[in-house]
Amino acid sequence: MNYYSAIIKRYQERIGTDKLPRITIESINMYHMFRLLDAQQYDKVAGYVGAAANNLLKARCDFGLMCGNTPHLLFDQIQARTDLPLLSIVETAVAAAQQLHLQRLALLDTKFTMQSDFFIKPF
């Protein structure tokens, strides 16, 4: 889980090496989500991921992250199903690209992400 290690490293760089952040992970079955996407059952995908976000809310998390690009295909629909603030990987990527003055970016991902324009539009 590279993202977990990266979060810990960055946190300790900022806060101190003798500290660790409290992190709650709600892992979903991506294969189930992919089957729902293949069947174009987008409302069920939003409900499935939204329910996971609500589990994080019940765990008293301050915000949520979806560590894959593909769920962001339905970011607004998922956010509408939970009161937990979700951070958008798309908005974060746009902000980082602008800050670094990047003009051409590459994206490697699932067929669902690659066949959609949700990641291209903001750029």
List PLM regions with ranges.
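Short, acidic/small-residue loops that bind anionic groups at enzyme active sites
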Residues: 15-18, 78-98
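Generic structural signal for hydrophobic
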Residues: 55-56, 78, 97, 123
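N-terminal glycine-rich "phosphate-gripper" loop used for MgATP/nucleotide binding
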Residues: 59-75
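Short, glycine-/small-residue-rich phosphate/pyrophosphate-handling segment
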Residues: 102-123
